[in-house]
A protein has these predicted regions:
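Beta-strand-rich interaction surfaces with strong enrichment in secreted/lumenal proteins
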Residues: 30-38, 61, 95-101, 130-131, ...
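Activation corresponds to long, low-complexity, non-globular regions
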Residues: 163-187
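Flexible glycan-contacting loops in extracellular carbohydrate-active proteins
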Residues: 130-155
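Short, aromatic/His-centered strand-loop micro-motif at the edge of beta-sheets
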Residues: 87-108
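Short tryptophan-centered beta-strand motifs in secreted/extracellular beta-sheet-rich domains
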Residues: 45-47, 104-122
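Secretory/extracellular carbohydrate-interaction modules
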Residues: 20-91
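Extracellular glycan-recognition surfaces and repeat-rich motifs
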Residues: 1-29, 177-184
Length: 187
């Protein structure tokens, strides 16, 4: 089937493009590019996306991701914006709103996560405001699409206090790993 993701250039600007046309054989897949780690929490994520197909499939941003098969996703699908929880091949729709998107325009998706509270925006307008236990765990940020789509950028931001908290959790985990590994010096 070829590569899922490629870097393209148009008028001097680079894009990350998901190129696969069908992602259902031999099983359902969700092409995803991720950044960050499991310690990321309470952040804002923003990305630009232009879809090249609007008849089927989806494109959006993932967050609170443990991996590509366990994350929250704010996406365009079926002429709606949706917040869904993906776990393996199962997709649980948490909330959706009608949205008449097209393949001519580029859309700015933004999600703000604070504890269990999630707010989702398109082009600066809030469409979803929800509390969900799936957000509490935190995790990586991602772009994801099951249709050909171009992502121009992705930004993830936290405030200084949250950044310090994330770094402390990461260091605590690293110290625990180092301690556990020290008991097995020959490994």
């Amino acid at each position: 089937q070829g590569a899922s993701w490629v870097i393209t250039e148009y008028c001097g600007k680079h894009y990350m493009e998901q190129m696969r046309l069908h992602n259902t054989e031999p099983h359902r897949t969700f092409p995803t590019l991720e950044t960050g780690d499991r310690f990321w929490k309470d952040y804002d994520i923003e990305a630009s996306v232009r879809m090249f197909n609007t008849k089927w499939g989806n494109a959006g941003i993932g967050f609170c991701a443990q991996n590509s098969l366990n994350m929250l996703v704010f996406m365009f699908e079926d002429k709606q914006v949706k917040l869904v929880y993906r776990h393996k091949e199962n997709v649980e729709e948490l909330e959706s709103k009608a949205f008449d998107y097209n393949s001519d325009d580029t859309y700015i998706l933004n999600v703000s996560v604070n504890g269990s509270h999630v707010e989702c925006y398109v082009n600066g307008t809030k469409y979803i405001d929800i509390d969900t236990v799936y957000a509490v765990q935190g995790g990586k940020a991602a772009i994801t699409a099951t249709i050909p789509a171009a992502f121009g950028y992705i930004n993830v931001n936290v405030d200084e206090k949250t950044d310090e908290r994330i770094k402390a959790k990461r260091e605590e985990y690293s110290n625990k790993c180092t301690e556990a590994q020290s008991r097995y010096p020959k490994m």
